[in-house]
């Protein structure tokens, strides 16, 4: 049976959700973040990088969110949650499936990093670290985030979902960046369509079932 190596408050929540949408049976092995929010060393026994998400299935170990989504759709989807091949929607699907981690998440991770750095710096260095962090946020990170959030808002003005009128696995993939942006990027300020997207996904029965299976989930808080 497919096994999800599930780290709390992590991208692996999307994997549970995708499996619930498809009705795939799976087992969960749970891992808790350490006090510094890092994944525990036990995950390295599953994959050398010790990162989440990771799944094991039929003798295969698959890491990386996009690769996992593709594997699950190819293996268990039976044409569901993916547009037909050789259509504009399929091209859009592929783009968003990989954009989520390749382009959307880096500025959100930098936002988290530069926000946490002053809090974790030694007391004597804290004023300097805060100054450097604020400068990086102001000149580099926040402008990038605003650009991405405006991009999402514009795309979601065309249709309810990122690939068109049908919900797909690409929307599941995009959920994490939007949830992170709502938590710490200001998405709730002037991006009503993006926030409505979050309302729609949070209301899906499979999303709620994934929360019940995975446990408490809070992105970037």
Which role does the model predict for each range below?
Residues 36, 218-219:
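Generic structural signal for helix capping and beta-alpha/helix-loop junctions
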């Amino acid at each position: 049976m497919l096994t999800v190596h599930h780290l709390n408050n992590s991208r692996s929540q999307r994997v549970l959700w995708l499996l619930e949408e498809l009705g795939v049976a799976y087992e969960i092995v749970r891992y808790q973040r350490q006090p510094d929010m890092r994944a525990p060393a036990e995950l390295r026994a599953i994959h050398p990088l010790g990162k989440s998400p990771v799944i094991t299935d039929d003798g295969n170990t698959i890491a990386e969110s996009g690769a996992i989504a593709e594997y699950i759709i190819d293996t268990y989807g039976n044409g569901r949650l993916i547009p037909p091949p050789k259509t504009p929607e399929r091209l859009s699907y592929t783009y968003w499936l990989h954009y989520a981690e390749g382009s959307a998440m880096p500025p959100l991770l930098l936002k988290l990093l530069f926000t946490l750095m002053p809090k974790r710096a030694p007391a004597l260095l804290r004023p300097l670290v805060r100054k450097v962090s604020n400068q990086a946020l102001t000149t580099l990170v926040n402008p990038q985030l605003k650009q991405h959030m405006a991009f999402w808002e514009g795309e979601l003005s065309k249709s309810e979902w990122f690939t068109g009128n049908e919900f797909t696995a690409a929307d599941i993939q995009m959920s994490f960046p939007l949830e992170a942006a709502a938590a710490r990027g200001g998405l709730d300020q002037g991006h009503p369509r993006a926030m409505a997207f979050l309302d729609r996904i949070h209301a899906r029965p499979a999303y709620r079932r994934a929360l019940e299976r995975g446990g408490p989930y809070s992105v970037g808080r």
